[in-house]
């Protein structure tokens, strides 16, 4: 920045005029344009000289100002500098070079120089060329900085879009939350799978993908549900219920089965059967809700064991169909909908709430068979209030024999009462039973 000197004081960054020994008016060629040096130090002395501009590197000059020297008459008396001459202001990003400023108490007198006008013109032209070269370098530096800034900005945007975690997908983000989830739950087993934070662990990815889909890919909601499900498993220990607990045969015998069938496409269809018409004493079966829930959880674990998730070798496609699901069949033959016992409602409500939390996205389709015609309208009316995804999974059937037409890829293997040619349902898998009045753990 230029300092404001006294009227009798020469200003910095203004080239001195070149004069003959005698007071003579020297006119510079009007066609000559001299560009002001970017950073020039003018030293004040008794004999004023114009120094070559020092090499100064600036990153981004705001502007380049050229100034034509005006003809002036120099006398032997002190030179008077026109205060109206504009002083170019140069702003750079680098620290400004220090300019030696004249003392406020000293007046500067320009003395005649012996240089010829042509020599001065050559020197000025040399200064001009040096300035042009410096300007070109500065422009190149500016372009490089702009390109670098653009590259940095693009990288930042890409990083934000990537959600700042792994590859940016909801599943990848869910993986990054898994260590904290396991620590919060103080448990790491889900459906026979020991959860592993490594993204290459196929079985863990299946579990996480199911919890994500149950929450519309909302990671915080899926995280909260997974923590709750892990805590529930830690307390309930459903695998031990399947392996070690003998349930009361009087209460739960013939109430639930699991079957597996090879499909015509080369896969496997797992079906869980709930035969509510087999209940002999409603109050005994449903009045103890915690006991009923344990029995139902053990049957569900048996179904998952048939799915064999722990040995799966392929992940669920991110936006593709889930091959790791089962079919459920609820048979209401001989069940009265008009005289529904409150204990049945309580047990059903608790089961629905618990299973939706602890076993998300394991249901492929659910068939309600042998539903009385008089109650068929209820399921039709439900379609008005249920989501499209839920409606696709629920199928009320008035007759059990119609089930085979709903599952054509395994129809012939189904029991005869369900439209197939297979063996009796009692030949299917079930939980352990005791002959006593209460369930007991072996």
Curated annotation (Swiss-Prot):
SUPFAM superfamilies: CRAL/TRIO domain, CRAL/TRIO N-terminal domain
Cofactor: heme b
SMART domains on file: SEC14 (SM00516)
Biased composition (Polar residues): 1-10, 58-92, 101-117
GO molecular function, one term: metal ion binding
Annotated signal peptide: none
Protein name, per record: Phosphatidylinositol transfer protein sfh5
Organism: Botryotinia fuckeliana (strain B05.10)
Source species taxonomy: Eukaryota, Fungi, Dikarya, Ascomycota, Pezizomycotina
């Amino acid at each position: 920045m230029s300092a404001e000197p006294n009227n009798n004081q020469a200003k910095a960054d203004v080239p001195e005029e070149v004069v003959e020994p005698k007071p003579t008016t020297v006119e510079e060629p009007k066609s000559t344009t001299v560009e002001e040096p970017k950073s020039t130090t003018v030293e004040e002395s008794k004999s004023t000289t114009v120094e070559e501009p020092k090499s100064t590197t600036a990153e981004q000059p705001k502007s380049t100002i050229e100034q034509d020297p005006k003809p002036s008459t120099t006398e032997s008396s002190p030179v008077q500098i026109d205060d109206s001459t504009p002083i170019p202001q140069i702003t750079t990003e680098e620290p400004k070079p220090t300019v030696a400023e004249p003392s406020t108490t000293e007046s500067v007198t320009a003395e005649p120089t012996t240089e010829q006008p042509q020599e001065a013109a050559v020197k000025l032209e040399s200064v001009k060329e040096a300035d042009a070269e410096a300007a070109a370098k500065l422009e190149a530096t500016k372009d490089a900085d702009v390109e670098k800034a653009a590259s940095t900005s693009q990288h930042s945007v890409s990083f934000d879009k990537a959600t700042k975690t792994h590859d940016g997908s909801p599943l990848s983000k869910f993986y990054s939350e898994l260590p904290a989830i396991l620590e919060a739950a103080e448990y790491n087993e889900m459906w026979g799978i020991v959860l592993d934070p490594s993204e290459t662990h196929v079985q863990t990815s299946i579990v996480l993908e199911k919890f994500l889909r149950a929450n519309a890919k909302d990671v915080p909601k899926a995280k909260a549900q997974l923590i709750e499900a892990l805590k529930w498993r830690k307390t309930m220990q459903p695998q031990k219920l399947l392996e070690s607990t003998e349930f009361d045969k009087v209460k739960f015998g013939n109430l639930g089965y699991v079957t597996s069938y090879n499909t015509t496409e080369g896969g496997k269809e797992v079906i869980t059967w709930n035969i509510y018409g087999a209940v002999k004493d409603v109050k005994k079966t449903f009045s103890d809700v915690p006991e009923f829930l344990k029995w139902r959880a053990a049957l569900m674990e048996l179904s998952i064991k048939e799915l064999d998730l722990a040995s799966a070798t392929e992940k669920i496609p991110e936006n593709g169909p889930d091959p790791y699901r089962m079919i459920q069949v609820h048979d209401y033959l001989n069940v009265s909908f008009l005289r529904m016992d409150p204990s049945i409602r309580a047990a059903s409500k608790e089961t629905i709430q618990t299973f939706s939390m602890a076993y998300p996205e394991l249901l492929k389709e659910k068939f309600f068979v042998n539903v009385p015609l008089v109650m068929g309208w209820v399921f039709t009316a439900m379609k008005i209030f249920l989501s499209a995804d839920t409606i696709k999974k629920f199928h009320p059937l008035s007759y059990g024999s119609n089930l085979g037409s709903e599952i054509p890829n395994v129809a012939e293997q189904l029991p005869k009462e369900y439209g197939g040619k297979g063996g009796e349902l009692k030949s299917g898998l079930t939980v352990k039973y005791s002959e006593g009045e209460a369930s007991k753990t072996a």
